[in-house]
């Protein structure tokens, strides 16, 4: 089965803002990132990232078509 998998190139993106945390335990960060390569160079996306991340980090995105929904306000 591994032979049938097709390799997709990843695109580098730089984290420019950490917007907040999401997920049941807050393990997912919502970030705004600037695409550094590919057909969407210069585009700014909102993405959800798993794991620790800070402004200035480089992340590799498998695709640049989808964008995460904005976080809603927390209800009390």
UniProtKB/Swiss-Prot annotation:
Entry keyword Ribosomal protein: yes
Gene Ontology molecular function terms on file: structural constituent of ribosome
Top-level division of the source organism's lineage: Archaea
Single biological process term from Gene Ontology: ribosomal small subunit assembly
UniProt keyword list: Ribonucleoprotein, Ribosomal protein
PROSITE patterns in alphabetical order: RIBOSOMAL_S28E
Record carries keyword Ribonucleoprotein: yes
One GO cellular component, as annotated: cytosolic small ribosomal subunit
PANTHER family attached to this UniProt entry: 40S RIBOSOMAL PROTEIN S28 (PTHR10769), SMALL RIBOSOMAL SUBUNIT PROTEIN ES28 (PTHR10769:SF3)
Protein family according to the UniProt entry: Belongs to the eukaryotic ribosomal protein eS28 family.
Name of the featured protein: Small ribosomal subunit protein eS28
Lineage: Archaea, Methanobacteriati, Methanobacteriota, Methanomada group, Methanococci
Underlying gene: rps28e
